[in-house]
Amino acid sequence: MSFPSLQEQLDIITANTVEIISSAELEQKIQHSIKTGAPLKVKLGADPSRPDLHLGHSVVLRKLREFQDLGHEAILIIGDFTAMIGDPSGKSKTRPQLSAEEARENGASYFEQASKILDPHKTTICYNADWLGNMTFADVIRLSSHYTVARMLERDDFERRYRSSEPISIHEFLYPLAQAMDSVHLRNDVELGGTDQKFNLLVGRDLQREYGILPQVCITMPLLVGTGGEDKMSKSLGNAVCFNDLPSDMYGRVLSIPDTLIENWCRLLLPLTGEGRRAILEGWEEDPRTAKRRLAREIVMQYYSAGEAGAAEEHFDRLFVHKQAPTEIELTRFSEPELPLVDLLTTLGAAASKTDARRMIQQNAVSIDEEKITDVKTIITLSDEPKTLKAGKRKFFRIATAGNS
C-alpha cells in the first residue's frame, strides 16, 4: 500500500493538536509505515457514559478520520467495561458507575453516530469488555503491580483531591490501568484523546513498554468550548450541540455561540481543506454574523444533507429574523382541561425537570399565544381550540384538550 509523503502526513496529523508524545517517534512510525506499506493502528476510546455524542467528541473523531484518509487503520474502542468504573479525569469527586446494561445501551448507538464523521467501512470497532471482562482477580493484582500510588497522584485531579482530603476510591486508580490494557491488547501505534486524557494515554504508553510492546505515540487534541463560551462542551452543563440534534436545533445552537468562538470552532470542527472553512477564517472578524451563519450551515451539513441545512437556515430566519411562528407544529392533546404550567412544560419535554421549568418561567422564557407568563403557579386552561406554547427561543408546541380534531 502506498501512502502520502512523510511531510504531507505530518502537515495533516499535527494540525490543531496540542501535544504529541513524541514527535520524533511519530515520524519514525510514519517512515516505517511508508517503507513497509503497513498502516499505523490508531486508537480512540470513548466511554458511553451518556447515549449522545456531541461536537466536542467530533474534534478527536475528525483527527481519527484524517488518519483514515491517509490510509491508516482506525480503531474505535467503546469502553463498555471502563464506563462501569467511571473516568475520574478532571473530576473533583467520584463519578457514578454505570451498570453493564446502561453501558451497553449507551454504547449501542455510538458507532452509528461516529460514522457521521468516520468511514464506517474502514473502522474497526471493539468493546473493551471483551478482554477486560475476562481478567481474573489475579490478573488485576499483576496489572496493579506495574504502577505506583505515587505515579497515580501525579495526576492533577487526584493530587487536588488528596490535598483537600476528598475521597479517592481504589477503583478510580484502576481506571487508567484498565484503559491502558486496551493499548496492550490492541498493540496500537497511536492513541488520540482530549487534553484531559493525557495521563490515561501516558499510562497506556508506559504499560505497553512494560509488556515489551513498542510504546504508542500519544496525540492530545483541544477541548471544545461549549456554546456559552466558557466551560468545555458537556451535555450535563447544557452547552452541547449533539450529533442527533434536529437540523434546526443544531443550526440555532451554533448561531448562539459568542463571536469570540467562531475562529476556534471553525478550525476544530471543519475539514482542513474546503472553501467554507477558508471563507469563514478570512472574513469572521469583519463580518461575524455572516461567518457564524456559514459556520452553522457547514456544521449541519456534516451531519445532514445540504438541503436540510438550508431548510434549517430558513426555519431560523422565519422564527427570529421575520418573527413568524413555525408553519408546522405537532398538536398535543391532553385529557385534563386544566394543567399547571410547570407540569405542562415537563410533560412536553420543554423542560428537563420541574426546577428547570420554574427557572424558564421566572426568566420570561415561556409564553402562550405570544403572552409572556412569569408566575410559576400559573394554571393553563385548555379547550378544543389549540394554543401555541413557546418555551425558550426555539421550542414551539400546540396544545389542546382531547376533544375534536
From Swiss-Prot:
Its main location: cytoplasm. Its EC number is 6.1.1.1. A motif ('HIGH' region) lies at residues 48-57. It is found in: Cytoplasm. InterPro entries: aa-tRNA-synth_Ic (IPR002305), Rossmann-like_a/b/a_fold (IPR014729), S4_RNA-bd_sf (IPR036986), SYY-like_C (IPR054608), Tyr-tRNA-ligase (IPR002307), Tyr-tRNA-ligase_bac-type (IPR024088), Tyr-tRNA-ligase_bac_2 (IPR024108). One of its GO terms (molecular function) is ATP binding. Keywords: Aminoacyl-tRNA synthetase, ATP-binding, Cytoplasm, Ligase, Nucleotide-binding, Protein biosynthesis, RNA-binding. A motif ('KMSKS' region) lies at residues 232-236. It is an enzyme of class 6 (ligase). Residues 339-400 form the S4 RNA-binding domain. ATP binds at K235. This is Tyrosine--tRNA ligase. It comes from Chlorobium luteolum (strain DSM 273 / BCRC 81028 / 2530) (Pelodictyon luteolum). The gene is tyrS.
